[in-house]
A protein has these predicted regions:
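Hydrophobic residues in alpha-helical segments
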Residues: 89, 98, 119-121
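Acyl-donor (CoA/ACP) binding surface of acyl/acetyltransferases
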Residues: 2, 7-10, 18-83, 87-96, ...
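Generic hydrophobic, helix-prone segments enriched in Leu/Val/Ile
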Residues: 107, 116-120, 148
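Conserved GNAT-fold acetyl-CoA-binding loop/helix
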Residues: 93-115, 125-126
């Protein structure tokens, strides 16, 4: 509290057949309501500095840093990023192959607030912000999304217009693939792009993705998406 960190319930728990209490510890019976405790660890060894730092950021409403590359920082989105995203998405080329933002900024802010709370809070991953490692400028987004009908996650990426063609998407996505395997435990990922989006197609192939099938979203063949997958072996 002295450092501005909100207080949250904390209770050491030990499992036993018969529920008793001893000092500050709770001996856990077969059933126990833990709904008031936002973080539950099964082993004391799981309490590592990096994990505690992530909890600190969550409680203070700060974006957690996910990873760094040679030129970029990948971190969670925060509400302060919304204005930067509207500036980036104002270029028509950005929304040529992907969905745009809400027309009303207050709706985008509300969506972002819920995304931070539920997507990051529950799954611990999602679409992240890409920052220039030197200037701190927001230069794009990249990350992993879940689909209701899929167990594997979808890789997504976007680099602002004036920073495209510099190899940044490849640099960041390569690091995200490693993170997905080593930190999140994914065995494979998929990605979708339109066949006429040649830059995206080339990026996926360079990353090691393989085409699966064409999936038409509309009756026009030019709007068909190609699905790619990669095994994280």
């Amino acid at each position: 509290k002295k450092k501005g960190i909100p207080a949250v319930p904390c209770l050491p728990v030990i499992y036993a057949e018969n529920p008793i209490t001893a000092g500050n510890e709770k001996i856990m019976a077969k059933e126990m309501d833990l709904s008031g405790y936002p973080y539950v660890l099964e082993q004391a060894e799981e309490v590592e500095e990096a994990y505690l730092e992530k909890i600190r950021c969550r409680l203070l409403g700060l974006p957690c840093e996910i990873l760094q590359t040679k030129r970029c920082i990948v971190r969670e989105i925060c509400l302060a990023d919304v204005d930067n995203l509207y500036e980036i998405y104002a270029d028509p080329s950005i929304t040529l192959y992907m969905e745009g933002l809400y027309a009303k900024k207050e709706e985008e802010i509300a969506y972002t607030r819920d995304y931070i709370r539920y997507q990051y809070g529950i799954y611990d991953f999602g679409m992240w912000i890409i920052e220039d490692g030197q200037s701190g400028e927001v230069i794009g987004r990249a990350g992993l999304d879940l689909r209701p009908d899929r167990e594997d996650a979808e890789l997504g990426y976007m680099i602002r217009k004036n920073r495209q063609g510099q190899g940044l998407a490849y640099e960041v996505c390569t690091a995200i693939l490693a993170y997905a395997k080593e930190e999140l435990g994914f065995e494979k990922l998929f990605a979708r792009t339109r066949k006429e989006n040649l830059a995206s197609v080339m990026l996926l192939k360079k990353l090691g993705f393989h085409p699966v099938c064409a999936q038409s979203e509309t009756k026009e063949a030019d709007n068909a998406q190609i699905e790619y997958y990669i095994a994280l072996s």
